[in-house]
């Protein structure tokens, strides 16, 4: 066996080992990302347009399972409240226990005397003015919730006289919405609003969904790349072998 042949065989064995490692690592990342996502996230279909334009009617969203104590102002949450309806609902948290809420002087939602910028509203001034909220204090352990489509949302403003100032218990929260999964033209992560960041407690950090997506995509690339190595290497080997045979035949 010539030195060139031994070198080629060595390269082939090393390539096969690396290919196997790539496929194995890719499977771990790909499956791990999916399993991690299934544990952390729950898909929901939003039946109404009360969260438009952020989330449209019929949109499929991905919501991270969290405890109610983790909720911050600005979060879009999935919750169940029997006095509001039988199905899970999706609204934005604008006030937490101890907050003083009112709306809408100068067309602005006010929390603890601070005007809140709400760039997610479709009609800034009009939407806010349409939502009249008398000065209301949120009881401890409870949340004040509004839809982004203020003129067409059955939220805390529709339940101000129901008791607890129209608020919902933190324990009613099932998950926090991180992304829109469907339709494709709306696909993507939801931005955390900055308007509440200056208030005590700030806003929540994004969930691990982005890392999960990176793990799944990276795993898929490694699996496909590793699986493709074998056929590519064999084809290259045949070409080298054919070239070597021609050179040997030409010597004489």
Label each region the model flagged:
Residues 2-30, 37-45, 53, 57, ...:
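Soluble "head" domains of membrane/secretory-pathway proteins
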């Amino acid at each position: 066996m010539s030195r060139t042949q031994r070198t080629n065989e060595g390269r082939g064995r090393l390539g096969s080992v690396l290919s196997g490692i790539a496929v194995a690592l890719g499977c771990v990342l790909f499956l791990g990302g999916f399993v991690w996502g299934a544990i952390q996230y729950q898909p929901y279909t939003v039946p109404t347009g009360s969260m438009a334009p952020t989330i449209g009617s019929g949109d499929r969203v991905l919501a991270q399972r969290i405890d109610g104590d983790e909720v911050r102002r600005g979060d879009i949450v999935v919750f169940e409240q029997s006095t509001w309806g039988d199905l899970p609902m999706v609204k934005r948290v604008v006030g937490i226990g101890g907050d003083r809420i009112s709306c809408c002087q100068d067309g602005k939602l006010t929390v603890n005397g601070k005007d809140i910028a709400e760039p997610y509203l479709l009609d800034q001034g009009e939407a806010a003015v349409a939502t009249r909220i008398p000065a209301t204090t949120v009881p401890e352990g409870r949340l004040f919730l509004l839809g982004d489509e203020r003129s067409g949302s059955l939220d805390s403003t529709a339940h101000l006289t129901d008791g607890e100032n129209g608020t919902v218990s933190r324990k009613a929260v099932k998950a926090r919405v991180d992304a829109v999964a469907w339709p494709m033209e709306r696909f993507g992560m939801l931005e955390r609003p900055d308007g509440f960041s200056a208030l005590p407690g700030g806003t929540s950090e994004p969930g691990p969904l982005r890392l999960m997506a990176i793990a799944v995509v990276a795993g898929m690339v490694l699996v496909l790349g590793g699986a493709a190595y074998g056929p590519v290497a064999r084809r290259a080997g045949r070409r080298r072998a054919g070239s070597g045979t021609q050179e040997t035949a030409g010597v004489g």
